[in-house]
Regions:
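Conserved Radical SAM active-site core
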Residues: 2-6, 20, 35-121, 125
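Hydrophobic pocket-lining residues within nucleotide cofactor-binding pockets
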Residues: 29, 77, 142
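Auxiliary Fe-S-binding modules of radical SAM enzymes
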Residues: 5-15, 63-65, 94-196
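Ubiquitous "structural anchor" signal
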Residues: 25, 82-83, 148, 163
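Glycine-centered flexibility motif
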Residues: 17-19, 28, 47, 69, ...
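N-terminal pre-triad scaffold of radical SAM enzymes
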Residues: 5-32
Length: 196
């Protein structure tokens, strides 16, 4: 089995999630959204092999008080072969920086959460392990006709910024699947003082 490749790593990234982050762009995506911002990463062979030394460098980069966490995007992190290449790494990051440590893990996917549920198009034997480590999941394909420059952390209005911790808690409380318990992230100060 070939190792996963990565197209780029951005240290001190302020565009792809809250705060200052290390962002890993994995290689490989079969979706081919029109006007994708990163079509260079569609090719699974693009970039360099994602090996243990690269993992170590990323984990080390998170060990600064001014770094808020890791963002995984691409390419498509949830392509089945990329999930296989990411699962151990994501669990290593979560073990090094547990929930509540102040370091968050964001993931951007062209899949909707429903496609990552059991029976879904991109659900594999490791999907649940990856989802369990995520604080935020930005889901849905980029749709040029729904492009909106005013949106934070997403390109088109169909995409959702899902608060995975709140979603997991609600799913457990209500005894339903994650996709039936979606809690959206809110960053507008209006929301912090009003219950919706």
């Amino acid at each position: 089995e070939l190792p996963m490749n990565y197209a780029n790593i951005k240290y001190f990234d302020i565009a792809d999630g809250e705060g200052v982050r290390t962002s890993l762009f994995v290689s490989g995506c079969r979706r081919g959204c029109k006007n994708c911002f990163n079509s260079v990463a569609w090719d699974f062979a693009a970039g360099e092999p994602f090996d243990r030394a690269v993992e170590d460098k990323i984990i080390e980069s998170l060990d600064h008080p001014f770094i808020d966490g890791l963002t995984i995007l691409g390419g498509e992190p949830m392509e089945p072969e990329n999930q296989a290449g990411l699962v151990d790494f994501v669990e290593r990051v979560r073990a090094a920086y547990p929930a509540g440590s102040g370091k968050t893990i964001w993931c951007f996917t062209g899949d909707v959460l429903e496609e990552l549920m059991p029976g879904g198009r991109h659900h594999t034997e490791v999907t649940d392990r990856i989802l369990a480590c995520l604080d935020m999941l930005v889901d849905g394909p980029f749709v040029q006709d729904l492009y909106d420059i005013s949106l934070r952390f997403r390109g088109s209005s169909n995409q959702r910024v899902i608060d995975m911790n709140a979603t997991r808690a609600r799913a457990e409380r209500e005894g339903v699947a994650l996709c039936d318990a979606v809690e959206l992230w809110r960053d507008d100060p209006v929301y912090s003082t009003h219950t919706m």
